[in-house]
Design a protein with these regions (language model features):
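Acidic-glycine-rich active-site phosphate/pyrophosphate-binding loop
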Residues: 1-6, 23, 188-203
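Short pre-catalytic strand/loop immediately N-terminal to key active-site residues, enriched for Gly-Thr
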Residues: 13-19, 200-214
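Charged C-terminal helix
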Residues: 7, 58, 235-276
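N-terminal phosphate-binding or glycine-rich loops at protein starts, especially the Walker A/P-loop
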Residues: 9-33, 238
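Short, small-residue alpha-helix embedded
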Residues: 30, 148-149, 210-234
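Conserved phosphate/ATP/ADP-binding segment of small-molecule kinases
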Residues: 123-200
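Phosphate-handling active-site elements
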Residues: 34-39, 200-201, 227-241
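Conserved N-terminal subdomain of the carbohydrate kinase-like
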Residues: 2-12, 32-119
């Protein structure tokens, strides 16, 4: 739904990254770049920079749900993305809060491990994702390790990605996008696998060699949310969001001593032409 200069209203339910490369910081930058109005419900405050995570401070579950309801009962939220949730109680609080809102697109990014390798979720929260949140989702966007954990399938190639997507879809979500960036099979290409309406769609692109890759999953899921908030269907939203992510990666920047960050402010033609 159009709101003045904005193409829609979005909500990020995720953790805060003090380094600014991932989490709600990446989400809000993405929302701004793609001209949607961004709101948030913070699930945790992480102490991190480009070199790693040194602390995770969860927000109480009742406060997480209260944030969701504060925004959702006032704004007409067109799309929600979830990211780092951390615990079973947090997952249940998010599912409860979102269940009380009106119908909107839900993109569930099942964040489990930080780019640095630090764990961001408790074991029992994975079951809660499958039981409580994923059945509510329009789209789930796991990377390879997350897809393996959600599906119980070891992934070594694209056919395994397809099987994992099919298994995750059994939880009741609308669609599954298994991201192939973690699949290092010697190929110079990367394939993402989308399962939607019983069909399998492959997105294959050349691999971008860059160390400026912190926050790629957050950025992709928030870009999909932005495009769905503007009225695109899942296939269109994934297609346009992947274009945006690649542009962010190609123009990535080195801010600290560790992994570099994406260039979220990159200009995209389909957005700019709306305001010419």
């Amino acid at each position: 739904m159009r709101h003045g200069l904005y193409r829609g209203i979005t909500m990020s339910v995720a953790g805060s990254d003090s380094g600014g490369g991932a989490g709600i910081q990446a989400d809000l930058k993405t929302f701004a770049a793609l001209k949607v109005f961004g709101t948030t419900a913070i699930t945790a405050v992480t102490v991190q920079n480009s070199m790693g995570v040194t602390g995770v401070h969860p927000i109480p579950p009742n406060v997480i749900e209260a944030q969701i309801l504060a925004v959702g009962t006032d704004f007409h939220v067109d799309a929600v993305k979830t990211g780092m949730l951390g615990s079973r109680d947090a997952v249940c609080a998010v599912a409860s809060g979102l269940g009380k809102l009106g119908k909107c697109a839900l993109i569930a990014d099942p964040v489990m491990v930080a780019q640095s390798g630090d764990p961001l979720i408790e074991d029992d929260a994975v079951d809660a994702l499958l039981e409580k949140l994923i059945p509510m989702a329009s789209l789930v966007t796991p990377n390879i390790p997350e897809a393996e954990r959600l599906s119980g399938i070891s992934i070594a190639d694209v056919s395994d990605m397809e099987r994992a997507a099919e298994e995750i879809a059994k939880a009741g979500c609308g669609a599954v996008l298994v991201k192939g960036g973690h699949l290092h099979d010697g190929s110079r290409t990367v394939t993402d696998v989308l399962m939607i309406d019983g069909a399998i769609i492959h997105f294959t692109d050349s691999r971008i060699d860059t160390e400026s890759n912190h926050g790629t999953g957050c950025t992709l899921s928030s870009a999909i949310a932005a495009e769905m908030a503007s009225g695109r269907d899942i296939l269109e939203a994934v297609t346009f969001a992947r274009r945006y992510l690649r542009a962010c990666l190609i123009n990535g920047i080195k801010c600290g001593h560790g992994a570099g960050c994406l260039a979220h402010a990159v200009k995209m033609d389909w957005v700019d032409e709306l305001y010419a």
